[in-house]
Amino acid sequence: TIVSRIKYLIEKYKVRPEEILVVTFTRYAAGEMKSRLCAAMDQREIPVTVGTFHGIYYGILRWTYRMGPQNILSEEEKYQILRGVISRQKVEVFDEEDFLQDIAAEIGRIKNNRLDIESFVSEKCSADAFRAVYREYEAQRKKLKKIDFDDMLVLCYELFVSRPEVLSRWQKKFRYILIDEFQDINRIQYDVIRM
């Protein structure tokens, strides 16, 4: 298990706990991991960083760009923007709520898998309509100076590619990275972790 690997690294190889990063998919899993680690280490608090992909990437962006909660687009704001975009683009919709959820998921798929918008085929509307919706959604989001949850991953990737000194800082900080449920990560998560 990950907890036994962490204990092994610390006790056998004398790795400093501060150099270990554990990434999970949910806050609940992160909390469980911290509890199990504390129990495995005889109830001692160990300064291993444990968090979700979004939490860790947001922390990096917050440190680099001084972002705060005011920069995060809520789900409600996201759907409000998409509702306006769909109306302005005159996209035909049968069930608005389902359509909004599906379009938001497709936008997330593009970002999470670093797909090309030009070759992406939407299951919900024509390619031209989807590209128009995507571009206007992105323009509206940027105008508000906000990022959505998927942007946290994309921006972290772009940050590390464009600013090697920032990447180097985080590589030195976290020399050991362990991922819970590694087989479930998406392309952008993999690309950032691999760096």
Annotate each PLM feature:
Residues P47, R66-D151:
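ATP-hydrolysis module of ASCE/P-loop NTPase motor domains
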